[in-house]
Amino acid sequence: GTDKRQFRHFQTVKFEDLNNLVLSKERKGVGLLGYAVDKGVELNKGRIGAKEGPNAIKKAFAGLPDLNQCEEIVDYGNVEHSHEHLIETQEEYAILAAKSIKNHSQTFLLGGGHDIAYAQYLATRKVFPNQSIGVINIDAHFDTRDEDESTSGTSFRQILEQDEQADYLVLGISQGGNTQGLFDYAKQKEIQYVFADELLHQVS
C-alpha cells in the first residue's frame, strides 16, 4: 500500500554508496554505516563474532514500525576488514563516516568490535577539527591498554594520547576487571568513572 502510517522501516530505508555521495547543502535525515569488523577483538584475545553486529541490528530495525514517519534514512552498507593492519580499516571507516556526519542530522555507526570507538573519534574529529569532544563509554573496562597496535582494548588510550581536547567518562567500571596500571592511567589522564556497583545502587 501507499499509506505511510502503515509502513515499517524496511519500506522507507534507502541504500546508497558513500564513495559516490554528493554532499547536500544542509544536513538532514539519518545515515547508517556498519563496522562489520572484529579483528580488534581477535587481537585483544576476545571472542570473535562482533562483525555480525551491523546486519543483526539492521535486520531488527527493519521490522519496526515507522511510528513517527521519520526523516529519510539512508543505509550506506558496511565496512569490512580487508587491510593488513586494523588501523587502516579504522581510517577507511572514518573517512566514510565523516561524509555521513557532514550530510545528515544524525549518523548511527553500528559495530562491530569496540575498536569502532577510535574510528568514530577519527570521523568526528574530521568534521569538528577544533571543538572539544566528550566520550562516554558504558563498559566494565577502561579499554585504555598500552599495545603496539590498535585493538578493541586500546581505542580510548589512542584518543587521549593524541587529543588534549577529548574528555573521557566510563560508566560501569568493574574493580576486578582492570589492572592497577589502568587505574593509575585513569588518574594520570583525569578519566572520570563510576563503578558498576554504584550504578546498581542508584537504580535499586
Give the ranges of each region predicted by the language model.
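Conserved alpha-helical scaffold segments that buttress catalytic/binding sites
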Residues: 2-35, 39-204
